[in-house]
UniProtKB/Swiss-Prot annotation:
Keyword Lyase appears in the UniProt entry: no
Pathway: Carbohydrate degradation; glycolysis; pyruvate from D-glyceraldehyde 3-phosphate: step 2/5
Protein name: Phosphoglycerate kinase
Oligomer status and interactors: Monomer.
Lineage: Bacteria, Pseudomonadati, Pseudomonadota, Alphaproteobacteria, Rhodobacterales
Entry binding sites for substrate: D21, V22, N23, R36, H59, F60, G61, R62, R119, R152
Family to which the UniProt record says this protein belongs: Belongs to the phosphoglycerate kinase family.
Main location: cytoplasm
Gene Ontology cellular-component annotations: cytosol
EC number: 2.7.2.3
Subcellular compartments: Cytoplasm
Species the sequence originates in: Cereibacter sphaeroides (strain ATCC 17023 / DSM 158 / JCM 6121 / CCUG 31486 / LMG 2827 / NBRC 12203 / NCIMB 8253 / ATH 2.4.1.)
Reactions this protein catalyses: (2R)-3-phosphoglycerate + ATP = (2R)-3-phospho-glyceroyl phosphate + ADP
Length: 397
């Protein structure tokens, strides 16, 4: 799959419409975590260096096609200005029509313009061709730097890309390269770690992975469903008993594809789910009837450590236990730190993504050691499921 990048585009003197993700958390009208804003800086700076005029398009929250003051991108302007010191950043109170047209016409070289929330228009989420055409009128080139919104065919992510010469921004480019290295043409053996609470939410993911990876590690509440499918009692643990047949199908599909599935060998159980709860480690088949499985045990971690050490590529989505509460974060922490160590030693390419996953790796202090951490959430999951992402497909040459 090929796509153009900023290096392929002549941007001098051109207005460049850049789709970015600045959907940041806010409290009392102030940005509490500016990570997503900071990540778009390399793209904006590169466009400025090439003599282009960056005009930023983004959504914020879910206003459902109406103007909602608390979801105005005007609130993000101070944090964006902080991320681009020395660059004048202006704001236009719409993303189409006379106001942005005048603001674009008034731009000087070296300035940046942020447009209002694209989702204030109902046509954005419907991928309305008229809205996309009105956006396209504002610029000469389109750059998509919002991989996190690439799984949605919206006017500003898909429709617009088909109307102007288009390229991937630096963040999008990094994400696509990392994902291509992990699942497109990976170095083998490939290990996928899939955790989280429910099999039902990750069915497509598991079905796609068993045909593409050499080892599939299943953790979290999801592992309990697979244990139940094998006739193992899990006490009061979270398990989707109605998914047992589906779990058995995944196991047989994996066997046919030559993919080894790894389930917990021992588990940490407790009678209550709270920090510091009295707990014990037991063999997987020996979970007491009145207890619940909250983490994988040390034998499991030791076995996984051998699997990781033999791997060349690793993809991670979802924790191995109830990582939010100590001591049930032990397996996730130990596994994450080992992956980070192998990656730093040059033995492993490691890519992780999904909200809980990023939180778990940060908590373990391991995130910095991974080759690539995707902040994309839904788009990362759909990519792992093998689905075409409209925002990426629209950039493909």
């Amino acid at each position: 799959m090929g796509w153009k990048t900023l290096d392929d585009m002549d941007l001098a003197g051109k207005v460049v419409l850049v789709r970015v993700d600045v959907n940041v958390p806010m409290e009392n009208g102030e940005v509490t975590d500016a990570t997503r804003i900071e990540k778009i800086v390399p793209t904006v700076e590169d466009i400025l260096k090439k003599g282009g005029k960056p005009v930023l398009l983004a959504h914020f929250g879910r206003p459902k096609g109406k103007v909602v003051d608390e979801m105005s991108l005007r609130l993000v302007l101070p944090a964006l200005q902080n991320a681009l010191p020395g660059t004048k950043v202006s704001f236009a109170a719409d993303c189409v029509g006379p106001e942005p047209e005048q603001a674009v016409a008034a731009m000087l070289e070296g300035e940046v313009l942020l447009l209002e929330n694209t989702r204030f228009h109902a046509g954005e989420e419907k991928n309305d061709p008229e809205l996309a055409a009105a956006m396209a009128k504002l610029g000469q080139v389109y750059v998509n730097d919002a991989f996190s919104a690439a799984h949605r065919a919206h006017a500003s992510t898909e429709g617009l890309a088909r109307l102007l010469p288009s390229a991937a921004g630096r963040l999008m480019e990094a994400e696509l390269k990392a994902l291509e290295a992990a699942l497109g043409h990976p170095e083998r053996p490939v290990v996928a770690v899939v955790g989280g609470a429910k099999v039902s939410t990750k069915l497509d993911l598991l079905g796609n992975l068993v045909g593409r990876v050499d080892h599939l590690v299943i953790g979290g509440g999801m592992a309990n469903t697979f244990l139940v499918a094998q006739g193992i009692e899990v006490g009061k643990s979270l398990a989707e008993r109605d998914m047992a047949d589906t779990a058995r199908e995944i196991l047989s599909k994996a066997k046919a594809a030559g993919c080894t599935i790894h389930l917990p060998l021992d588990v940490v159980v407790a009678r209550e789910f709270k920090a510091g709860a009295a707990n014990e480690t037991v063999e997987t088949a020996a979970c007491p009837a009145d207890a619940m499985i909250l983490d994988a045990g040390p034998k499991t971690v030791a076995a996984l450590s051998e699997v990781f050490a033999s791997a060349k590529t690793l993809i991670w989505n979802g924790p191995l236990g109830a990582f939010e509460i100590e001591p049930f974060d032990a397996a996730t922490n130990a596994a994450a730190l080992q992956v980070a160590q192998l990656t730093k030693a040059g033995q492993l390419i490691s890519v992780a993504g999904g909200g809980d996953t990023v939180a778990a790796l940060n908590k373990a202090g391991a995130a910095e050691g991974f080759s690539y951490i995707s902040t994309a959430g839904g788009a990362f999951l759909e990519w792992m499921e093998g689905k075409e992402l409209p925002g990426v497909a629209a950039l493909t040459v």
